[in-house]
């Protein structure tokens, strides 16, 4: 004897499921944007300022890598990585040091020689910004998941 089941509201559930990728994507982008802005703001505050060039270069971007939303925060100036991580001893080029040396009243050659002997000390600004905000980032994505669930429940005629 065949059994026939009739699922009431199946059409609303199917429609909600069809919309779920857009709902999930919208909430992911929202949580990612807020997360990136938190890290970007603290990274900017963490940077020691001379000309503000490094601070002003810190920005964020989002991109898709296949099915994965990727968020990145960082400086657009090349020397940002050297400030974050420091450097081993090396002989640096003169031109990038001239302005700094002049503002600090130090001969460029003396700065070059010091870097050649000792390298430069790391002055992390980005990693501490992430570390400070990682719990808040987890909460932002958890809240996004809750909003997705509530939205899909509403769209399917259920209760969140």
Whereabouts are the PLM-identified features?
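Short, Lys/Arg-rich flexible segments
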Residues: 1-160
């Amino acid at each position: 004897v065949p059994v026939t089941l009739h699922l009431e509201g199946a059409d609303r559930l199917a429609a909600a499921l069809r919309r779920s990728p857009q709902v999930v994507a919208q909430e992911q982008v929202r949580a990612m944007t807020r997360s990136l802005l938190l890290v970007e703001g603290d990274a900017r505050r963490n940077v020691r300022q001379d000309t503000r060039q490094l601070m002003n270069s810190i920005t964020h971007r989002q991109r898709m890598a296949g099915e994965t939303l990727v968020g990145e925060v960082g400086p657009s100036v090349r020397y940002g990585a050297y400030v974050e991580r420091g450097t081993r001893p090396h002989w640096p080029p003169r031109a990038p040091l001239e302005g700094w040396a002049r503002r600090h009243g130090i001969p460029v050659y003396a700065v070059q020689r010091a870097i050649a002997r000792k390298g430069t000390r790391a002055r992390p600004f980005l990693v501490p910004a992430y570390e400070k905000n990682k719990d808040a980032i987890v909460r932002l994505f958890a809240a996004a998941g809750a909003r997705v669930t509530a939205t899909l429940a509403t769209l399917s005629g259920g209760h969140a």
